[in-house]
From Swiss-Prot:
It comes from Methanocaldococcus jannaschii (strain ATCC 43067 / DSM 2661 / JAL-1 / JCM 10045 / NBRC 100440). This is Protein translocase subunit SecE. Coiled coil: none annotated. Residues 63-74 are extracellular. Belongs to the SecE/SEC61-gamma family. The chain crosses the membrane at residues 37-62. The keyword Transport applies. It is a single-pass membrane protein. Keywords: Cell membrane, Membrane, Protein transport, Translocation, Transmembrane, Transmembrane helix, Transport.
Length: 74
């Protein structure tokens, strides 16, 4: 039981040391880097939206052909 606790403590220490190393390497992005990432992200989201719309329109049209609209009950 004592060794399990010591092992967990060692794992925690190693994790904290790895986090510290990563933190020391990190740097704040420049304005140009930030804008480049924002542009690529916006382009990707737009592309996914366009692809979704291209799939949605024919699917809706085909759905309308295969299943005629029902008449409302009075």
């Amino acid at each position: 039981m004592k060794t399990d606790f010591n092992q967990k403590i060692e794992q925690l220490k190693e994790f904290i040391e790895e986090c510290r190393r990563v933190w020391l390497v990190l740097k704040k992005p420049t304005k140009d880097e930030y804008l480049a990432v924002a542009k690529v992200t916006a382009l990707g989201i737009s592309l996914l939206g366009i692809i979704g719309y291209i799939i949605h329109v024919p699917a809706t049209y085909i759905k309308g052909i295969l299943k005629p609209p029902t008449t409302p009950r009075v």
